[in-house]
Amino acid sequence: AEAGYDYHADEEGFYDGVIYRLWGIDRKDAAGIGYAKNHDASVMWANTALSEKVQDGDDLQFFVQQKNELLAFFTQTEQTVSKDQNAVLRLRTANGNQYKDCAGASIYIDGELQEGLVTDENGRVTLPALAPSDTPYFITAKKTKQADGEEYTVISAAYSRLTVIQAGEVSENYVKSVTLRNVLDWYEKKQ
């Protein structure tokens, strides 16, 4: 525990202390840590993540809750467009395994609020044409609500990376996965 690995049950029987320690958060300062695997937030408490089996290609999301934020995500986390081309993103929320489009979320590009750029009733937003860049633009969304004179976040942090290339330039494709099979047995049987 001294090194930060706090893998024991707390007074309520939860084993998520390791996650709080990893993030340097005092449990009293957060309503909870939300968690989802492949956008399924039906069992979203971080203590269940410690026993979760993860497979290649799984998407894990953790977020610190201020109050009761919903898991939010862009349906495309990576996209490439040409210069002078507009990208369209769709923002959704998950409440358990029920999904809805997220309207009224403000959009940020590389950490800067884009005035007047918010998601519509279908969760969609059309980004302005951006200049080509060597590094992808980092697109995020934020939605807040006022209650009891206090403003708080109602969705988790959602992100998407947008690469903008010169018009006519070809985007590079990379192999995401390879399946290897033992062909030696097959070859020896043929001999």
Predicted features and spans:
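Ubiquitin-like/PB1-type beta-grasp interaction modules and other compact soluble beta-rich domains
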Residues: 1-191
